From Swiss-Prot:
It holds the Pfam family Ribosomal_L6. This is Large ribosomal subunit protein uL6. Part of the 50S ribosomal subunit. The keyword Ribosomal protein applies. The lineage of its organism: Bacteria, Pseudomonadati, Pseudomonadota, Gammaproteobacteria, Pseudomonadales. It comes from Marinobacter nauticus (strain ATCC 700491 / DSM 11845 / VT8). Gene3D superfamilies: Ribosomal protein L6, alpha-beta domain. Belongs to the universal ribosomal protein uL6 family.
Length: 177
């Protein structure tokens, strides 16, 4: 059985948390996030520590307490240090260029791919084959990275495509005669 909810969330300096009933607001130097907590989960704030517990002993309540603790911990990390995901473009002529709230990608199609970045997410291109996506919401940063990767996922024969920087692509051998 997981005991994630038993670990308290320690609030770093500069992070402010407000509890209004089942609503939790987390504010930090990078921005603010809010989350609605399920009725089965109880949250207690003690100075700079948040504690999570299930209101009853039901299995689902305990699971929700652990999930809520993990989500709030991600919110606290996001508003204090932020989240980032790195993507690499591998392939001849594969390029990326960030222009404001748009990301222009050349991925071997007959047309350039233009990706509109959602509010709260920024992208920068340190080189024309690297994309760094940053934001305060971990789920949103991961979603944007997954959507960009989905345009041209890495293929197993040559390894061409858009991949996460830490991703290992399983390579296959070409068919032999």
């Amino acid at each position: 059985m997981s005991r994630v909810a038993n670990n308290p969330v320690v609030l770093p300096s500069g992070v402010e948390v407000k509890l209004n009933g089942q609503e939790i607001n987390v504010k930090g130097s990078k921005g603010a996030l809010q989350f609605t907590i399920h009725q089965a989960v109880e949250v207690k704030q003690e100075e700079n520590v948040l504690r999570f517990a299930a209101r009853d002993g039901a299995k689902q309540s305990r699971a929700l307490a652990g999930t809520t603790r993990a989500l709030v911990n991600n919110m606290v990390t996001g508003v204090s240090t932020g989240w980032e995901r790195k993507l690499q473009l591998t392939g001849v002529g594969y390029r990326a260029q960030a222009q404001g709230k748009k990301l222009n990608l050349t991925l071997g199609f007959s047309h350039p791919v233009e990706y509109e970045l959602p509010e709260g997410v920024t992208a920068e291109t340190p080189s024309n084959t690297e994309v760094v996506i940053r934001g305060i919401d971990k789920q949103q940063v991961g979603q944007v990275a997954a959507e960009i990767r989905a345009f041209r996922p890495p293929e197993p024969y040559k390894g061409k495509g858009v991949r996460y920087a830490d991703e290992q692509v399983r390579r296959k051998e070409a068919k032999k005669k």
